[in-house]
From Swiss-Prot:
InterPro entries per record: PSI_PsaA (IPR006243), PSI_PsaA/B (IPR001280), PSI_PsaA/B_CS (IPR020586), PSI_PsaA/B_sf (IPR036408)
Pfam families: PsaA_PsaB
Protein name: Photosystem I P700 chlorophyll a apoprotein A1
Gene3D superfamilies (alphabetical): Photosystem I PsaA/PsaB
Binding positions (chlorophyll a'): 675
Binding locations of chlorophyll a: 683, 691
SUPFAM superfamilies: Photosystem I subunits PsaA/PsaB
HAMAP family with a match to the protein in the record: PSI_PsaA
Organism in which the protein naturally occurs: Jasminum nudiflorum (Winter jasmine)
Record's catalysed reaction(s): reduced [plastocyanin] + hnu + oxidized [2Fe-2S]-[ferredoxin] = oxidized [plastocyanin] + reduced [2Fe-2S]-[ferredoxin]
Length: 750
């Protein structure tokens, strides 16, 4: 820590009335670009308009102006998010069976959409229980609402209106901070102040206020709900806040107020700030008292973290000092210069944030099922499957985005003349070693992981089960994973004081938790089948990383095209007369990386879906016998490629294929339609631009003959545009197909 004299007095950090508000300007398509604003000559214009509308770098090179546009756009984004949230709460208030679900969450399915009777579409309104007919939803909103203490549709209305007000406020803020009071560049670059405010304000006070809400509102209301009290009889939230006696009846230590806190007798509060571990047997979710405790602890950590960085008072850490001190014996200049990169290149900053947020999103996916945070979430299999799948896809897209913006940084913002022997320079100088080794790892993983399956398929085909890799023949047990599981299962009592169960039931050791005769969670066994598919995961992830990292490290130059940086982020080929130089731009690496990201995530969600149906989800009889949805067939069936096709894809597709004439028929239509969208993508991906240009010229000739030719000349999509359209439809079609397949299946059997 460095003590310095205080900074000078607070500087004026905004420009007033920086840019006038002009609807005429906004009404002109392409007003941000001189060429596009001229209007269309050819149909390429509309594609350029879409490509460049949000590429603020192409509008101006002034970093301050770019920063202001990004900042303003963030408020617009927040406005849309609040609008979306408001819509969700409004549907809960107006069209849902929330109050009925609240009274019997184990037998009634959540629904918040009722289809109007137009051309027979009302067939989609299935019976979700309790006499309500509607579409079963799998977003988890009902479970969140219950956990936060919402007991009536009126409360949902109020929240929806509140979110609308916030949406309007955000829209106003976006306009205000660009047109009326636009921050100066120095404000955007003041990282210490930003860290303090984000850590202490957003994360610290945010967590503290949520912990406060949980203790004073959610916990008492959920206590009543768990005891079977009718939601209409439960006191309203403000009564708990205003009347301490009410809370003291449920949690006696409330009667003592803050005395235990100041006398350091904190264990008094353990009844509502608990440390149980495991799941609440009534709801199958984490103990809400554990969650409140967690948020209080997080709040304290972040409130401390938000006071660590040096701003106006000359005391605390400086980010620049930290980064420049960060060097080891073999790392040259270390992180020297990184501070300048991250305060002048928003692409570099965004790339780091996307990589971390993407990884975090995938961590969330894995915790939502292993430590289900909301009441009755674990027994709602459709929601569990949807939440896992959703967070996996989002994480995958964010990580590809990280590589995209890292490459844009390399092309547009990286200045090789000022960088020498820092870590980034050193990585770039030995990029050949990195990429060739990574390539070797991909080849090794690919042949060996796939080879294990091919061996099993061959042995199975030849009728030699005793020679297969399986739990009953040649075992390949995941011993390290089992060791980690076991360590965690034995941890309670040896690590955290007072913890009665391990963090997750999935580790083993504990009994199963079932709610209303349905399994919430139980110890998940790992065997040869998991070992095999795990190595497929390793293979697909390494290939994705290979493609993306190669795109970043070779974004500026390569042996093939030494002057690649001059060609920009996306270009089709290195000009005429240089064969074999197509598909080398940084953009093309992102394009190719998306396909492998899709491969990776598909295998993960297939693994999850089948494993959970086979070994976890199911019903519990009165005698205590568990019957799993697919009867534990994962261990023996998933060890061959044929098993995946026959017992997972084909066997479980029967629900979506046979959905016509039932309330699930929309999924059947989506399954079909999404396959079409996917197939449509191939037309863009497998076809050349010249083919289409020739076809267009014939069609234009016919239009001219009939004197109906448009003024705007039709043009075939450029190579890059065609690829962008192709990959979009490929991913959209693939994801929607998977969505229909998963939901029709799990709603029918779950």
């Amino acid at each position: 820590m460095i003590i310095r004299s205080p900074e000078p007095e607070v500087k004026i950090l905004v420009d007033r009335d920086h840019i006038k508000t002009s609807f005429e300007e906004w009404a002109r398509p392409g007003h941000f670009s001189r060429t596009i604003a001229k209007g269309p000559d050819t149909t390429t214009w509309i594609w350029n308009l879409h490509a460049d509308a949000h590429d603020f770098d192409s509008h101006t090179s002034d970093l301050e102006e770019i920063s202001r546009k990004v900042f303003s756009a963030h408020f617009g984004q927040l406005s849309i998010i609040f609008l979306w949230l408001s819509g969700m709460y409004f549907h809960g208030a107006r069209f849902s069976n929330y109050e009925a679900w609240l009274s019997d969450p184990t037998h009634i399915g959540p629904s918040a959409q009722v289809v109007w009777p137009i051309v027979g579409q009302e067939i989609l309104n299935g019976d979700v229980g309790g006499g309500f007919r509607g579409i079963q939803i799998t977003s988890g909103f009902f479970q969140i609402w219950r956990a936060s203490g919402i007991t009536s549709e009126l409360q949902l209305y109020c929240t929806a209106i509140g979110a609308l007000v916030f949406a309007a406020l955000m829209l106003f803020a976006g306009w205000f901070h660009y047109h009326k009071a636009a921050p100066k560049l120095a404000w955007f670059q003041d990282v210490e102040s930003m860290l303090n405010h984000h850590l202490a304000g957003l994360l610290g006070l945010g967590s503290l206020s949520w912990a406060g809400h949980q203790v004073h509102v959610s916990l008492p209301i959920n206590q009543f709900l768990n005891a079977g009290v009718d939601p209409k009889e439960i006191p309203l939230p403000h009564e708990f806040i205003l009347n301490r006696e009410l809370l003291a009846q449920l949690y006696p230590s409330f009667a003592e107020g803050a005395t235990p806190f100041f006398t350091l007798n904190w264990s008094k509060y353990a009844e509502f700030l608990s440390f149980h571990g495991g799941l609440d047997p009534v709801t199958g979710g984490l103990w809400l008292t554990d969650i409140a405790h967690h948020h209080l602890a997080i709040a304290i950590l972040f409130l401390i973290a938000g006071h660590m960085y040096r701003t106006n008072w000359g005391i605390g850490h400086g980010l620049k000092d930290i980064l420049e001190a960060h060097k080891g014996p073999f790392t040259g200049q270390g992180h020297k210069g990184l501070y300048e990169i991250l305060t002048t290149s928003w692409h570099a900053q965004l790339s780091l944030n996307l990589a971390m947020l993407g990884s975090l999103t995938i961590v969330v996916a894995h915790h939502m099922y292993s430590m289900p945070p909301y009441p009755y979430l674990a027994t709602d299999y459709g929601t569990q499957l949807s939440l896992f799948t959703h967070h996996m896809w989002i994480g995958g897209f964010l990580i590809v985005g990280a590589a995209a913006h890292a490459a844009i940084f390399m092309v547009r913002d990286y200045d090789p003349t000022t960088r020498y022997n820092d870590l980034l320079d050193r990585v770039l100088r030995h990029r050949d070693a990195i990429i060739s080794h990574l390539n070797w790892a991909c080849i090794f993983l690919g042949f060996h992981s796939f080879g294990l399956y091919i061996h099993n398929d061959t042995m199975s085909a030849l009728g030699r089960p005793q020679d297969m890799f399986s739990d009953t023949a040649i075992q390949l047990q995941p011993v390290f994973a089992q060791w980690i599981q076991n360590t965690h299962a034995l941890a309670p009592g040896a690590t955290a004081p007072g913890a009665t169960a391990s963090t997750s039931l999935t580790w083993g050791g504990g009994d199963l938790v079932a709610v209303g005769g349905k399994v919430a969670l139980l110890p998940i066994p790992l065997g040869t089948a998991d070992f095999l598919v795990h190595h497929i995961h390793a293979f697909t992830i390494h290939v994705t990383v290979l493609i993306l990292l190669k795109g970043v490290l070779f974004a500026r130059s390569s042996r093939l095209i030494p002057d690649k940086a001059n060609l920009g982020f996306r270009f089709p080929c290195d000009g005429p007369g240089r064969g074999g130089t197509c598909q080398v731009s940084a953009w093309d690496h992102v394009f190719l990386g998306l396909f492998w990201m899709y491969n990776s995530i598909s295998v993960v969600i297939f693994h999850f879906s089948w494993k959970m149906q086979s070994d976890v989800w199911g019903s519990l009889s009165d005698q205590g016998v568990v019957t799993h949805i697919t009867g534990g067939n994962f261990a023996q069936s998933s060890i061959t490629i044929n098993g995946w096709l026959r017992d997972f894809l084909w066997a479980q597709a029967s629900q979506v294929i046979q959905s016509y004439g039932s309330s699930l028929s929309a999924y059947g239509l989506f399954f079909l339609g999404a396959h079409f969208v996917w197939a449509f993508s191939l037309m863009f991906l497998f076809s050349g631009r010249g083919y289409w240009q020739e076809l267009i010229e014939s069609i234009v000739w016919a239009h001219n003959k009939l004197k109906v030719a448009p003024a705007t000349q039709p043009r075939a999509l450029s190579i890059v545009q065609g690829r962008a359209v192709g990959v979009t439809h490929y991913l959209l079609g693939g994801i929607a197909t998977t969505w229909a397949f998963f939901l029709a299946r799990i709603i029918a059997v779950g």
